Amino acid sequence: MSAGPLAARLAELGPYFAIQSHEPGLTPPGPWLPLAALLREPAVLTDRIGQVRDGLAAAGGRAPGQVEFRVAASVAQLGLSARLLAPALGAEVLGGWLRLDPGQVWWVPELGGPFGLSVPATALAVPGPAPVRGLLAGPVSELAGAVAARSVSARILWGNVASAISGAAAMISAARPDLAPRARAAAATALEFPALAGAGDGPPGTAGFRRRSCCLIYRLAAGPGTGLCGDCVLSGRRGRPGRSGQDEPGAAVDQLADRVQVTGMGGRLGDHVQDRLP
């Protein structure tokens, strides 16, 4: 599959899967940044977490200092991982191939919607191993390691990754019901990655999937029993019901967007910060 058709077919799955392309070897013009800098330059990751923290605070009507650092760090990692994994899973389901080399991928550090993602044109045309597996072993692992070094539990971070994979499969299934079996099978295969062992229960890409850790976004909830995501491990526990409608058909599609509105993936952010950012 050539670069043009694959990019167009990914865009048909929704904005979370959309990618742009650029000529290999170019220096990214502003506001684009190289993905490698985010993964390997601590100051860039610190800035992103701070940006997300400010966004969470503004969305919830509170001061940035009232948002715990580890909550912002978890949400930032979730959004970044999800934005990378969605097009990779989409490409795999569509029978294409997408290589996300951190040194060649560009991104735009913006909030309030699916942030821009650009890859070299050759990244969409050269066949290779399963794109999701390579992404998990490379950039996603690097990002999880960098955030874990900032006192965020690796269990939480890999739970975020599992949730992102399941959410991407759910969105593919909603956009293309004919691809639902392939999307769920690809997600299940991705969840066999060693670091994801025990990260979730139930079939990924459906409302029956539950992660075994919490992304921590509930800590910004307006009150007890609110602000839980549809796939949260806390859903259904006494005094902590999930958000309304979490088990209705289509609820799984919202799981990703509910938590990562301010990280650049769009959608709502649970019951407590539903307003969209500018």
Language-model segments: which ranges?
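Short linear motifs in low-complexity or flexible loops
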Residues: 249-252, 257, 263
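Polybasic, low-complexity intrinsically disordered segments
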Residues: 266, 275-278
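Hydrophobic, aromatic-lined core segments that form the binding pocket/scaffold
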Residues: 36-207
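A eukaryotic "domain-start" boundary segment
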Residues: 1-47
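Cys/His-clustered metal-coordination modules, chiefly Zn-binding fingers
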Residues: 174-248
